[in-house]
Amino acid sequence: MPLSEPRVSIVILNWNSYQVTLDCLLSLRKMDYRNFEVVLVDNGSVDGSPEKLLASAPEIRLIKNVTNLGFAGGCNVGMRDALRRGTDYILLLNNDTIVAPDFLGQLVRVAESDEKIGAVNPKILFFDHPDRLNYAGGEQKGWRLFPKVIGLRDRDNGRYDRMREVSFLTGCAFLIKAGVVRQIGVLEEVYFHFYDDIEWSLRLTRAGFKGVYVPKAVIWHREHFDTNKNHRNGFIEFYLARGNMVFARKHVPRKLWPFKMPFFCAWMVYRTLVFSSQRDWQKVLSLYKGFWAGCVTRLPEEDTSV
């Protein structure tokens, strides 16, 4: 291990997903970057998976939450633990990913090249369709309902192989400088699921740091593997609608609401028509419950300190 390699703490969440998480851990063992640790945060699993994972991968640092704290809450537990022990970088990594052997080294090299770079993302490909892009950078603007994911579902044919600055970094896999986290804080837990990475990206750019997409770093993603367990009962619809409204209330200037709300209403109507045509009333109900929850959720004080 070169003396110049910064220490990286890889924070991974597990929730009742032994085999998927183990596949991710096994891919990390094959990396050529060696100065790292894995902080596995179990989010209240009831299937015995945390104990089985520790037996299969005894090198991990296991933290067990009593209940499911959501993506942001679970990640924050791991991030704060790593920061207390003096890490140089934190890598938030979804458990349903497989990484290329040189992926972490590529990310660290770019992050180390410029003090204004606060966080970096890899190129993300679909696991089941490895010739298709899941993420090749992202853009976020105040009036948009969701960030624009560059290259989504396009073929990985070299078109997106240029490193670029981005305004949206996906929480699927992003490497963050520890000093930046100490300055701008951890993830906002009010979202529980979705939108926490969007807000963190916004705070990053507002603090004067850059987010960068690094195409030479590659991972493969089983997108929405965990959330699909809950898709039939409207989990995704609820948290997308709720998160959008919470984010808008917190961060979208009032002067932009006349531009944003027509898009949001059109999205709600479209989703309603789609689910109604499928006679999936649970998703319709979840969509409007999420909208209402987003309108009435108490917004927390700006305290995301470490």
For each feature predicted by the language model, list its residue ranges.
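Non-catalytic, C-terminal membrane-associated alpha-helical segments of glycosyltransferases
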Residues: F235-R242, P253-V306
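Glycine-rich, basic loop-to-helix element that forms the pyrophosphate-binding segment
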Residues: N65-R85
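Catalytic donor-sugar/metal-binding loop of nucleotide-sugar-dependent glycosyltransferases
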Residues: R182, V186-F192, I198-W220
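Short, acidic, metal-binding catalytic loop of nucleotide-sugar glycosyltransferases
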Residues: L26-N35
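Short beta-strand-to-loop acidic/aromatic patch adjacent to the donor-nucleotide binding site
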Residues: T87-I98
